[in-house]
Swiss-Prot record:
Family annotation (SUPFAM superfamilies): Ribulose-phoshate binding barrel
Species this protein is from: Mycobacterium sp. (strain KMS)
EC number per UniProt: 4.1.1.48
InterPro entries in alphabetical order: Aldolase_TIM (IPR013785), Indole-3-glycerol_P_synth (IPR045186), Indole-3-glycerol_P_synth_dom (IPR013798), Indole-3-GlycerolPSynthase_CS (IPR001468), RibuloseP-bd_barrel (IPR011060)
Superkingdom classification of source: Bacteria
Name of the protein: Indole-3-glycerol phosphate synthase
């Protein structure tokens, strides 16, 4: 019987898809395109603004829920998020399980003036140059998907291109690995990508062990302002919200409600 996890299956598909894209656009060419792209925006400054920041996600589907929303125009959705006060727009680009694409990333980048995060399963340097070529200011690195030397190498390459890495963890041991690699922004995902199970107490366990100079982002489980406030109380600097926004009838207002809660005087402030 196979012991392969959900994460293993996703990465297998990602590797095949990256190889197919590289057969069309070489590493040399994608590097040249990345160099020609507009300089990346300052993600760290955006995330350090007062209050609890909102990273709003363009997310068509997920492995745990299947199709989430029919997003006719990701640019319109991204503009709604920006108008609602989001600090960063996250765009899923993994195509097999999340129905994302680099076309979505292109559309969002052209539509908004705030930083954009490429959310994918980054396993090869090619994808980092690809992210920059398509206008990303930030990208996701998942500790559980990467051996330590690879994590450190990909993080270094990300920062060498002027981008910011959101380094995702699910356990205290993964958080230690992220810090060892030099992560400046750590996202704690309540969902275990190997099993898809959700542990809502995950952030509260891990965040107190992170240095005060690390930006702490809570991922998964934000359905409204109450969840944002709970994460703020546990030490979050920002929350990443996908499903709760793409399934909303009014995404702009949904983001605005979160932003209002995150900047309210009663909202717990991150310790710095």
């Amino acid at each position: 019987m196979s012991s392969a996890t959900v994460l293993d299956s996703i990465i297998e598909g990602v590797r095949a898809d990256v190889a197919a894209r590289e057969a069309v656009v070489s590493l040399t060419e994608i590097k040249e395109r990345a160099q020609r792209a507009k300089p990346p925006l300052d993600v760290m400054a955006a995330l350090r603004e007062p209050g609890i920041g909102v990273i709003a996600e363009v997310k068509r589907a997920s492995p745990s829920r299947g199709a989430l929303a029919q997003i006719g125009d990701p640019a319109d959705l991204a503009r709604a998020y920006q108008d609602g006060g989001a600090r960063v727009i996250s765009v899923l680009t993994e195509q097999r399980r999340f129905n994302g694409s680099l076309d979505d990333l292109d559309a969002v980048r052209a539509a908004v003036s705030i930083p954009v995060l490429r959310k994918d399963f980054i396993v090869r340097p090619y994808q980092i140059h690809e992210a920059r070529a398509h206008g990303a200011d930030m990208l996701l690195l998942i500790v559980a998907a990467l051996e330590q030397p690879v994590l450190e190498s990909l993080l270094e390459r990300t920062e060498s291109l002027g981008m910011t890495a959101l380094v995702e963890v699910h356990t205290e041991a993964e958080a230690d690995r992220a810090l060892q690699a030099g992560a400046r922004v750590i996202g704690v995902n309540a969902r275990n990508l190997k099993t898809l199970e959700v542990d809502r107490d995950c952030f509260a366990r891990i965040a107190p062990g992170l240095p005060s100079n690390v930006i702490r982002i809570a991922e998964s489980g934000v359905r409204g302002p109450a969840d944002l406030l709970a994460y703020a109380g546990a030490g979050a600097d920002a929350v990443l919200v996908g499903e709760g926004l793409v399934t909303s009838r009014d995404p702009r207002s949904a983001v605005a409600d979160l932003v209002t809660a995150g900047t309210h005087p009663s909202c717990p402030k991150p310790s710095r």
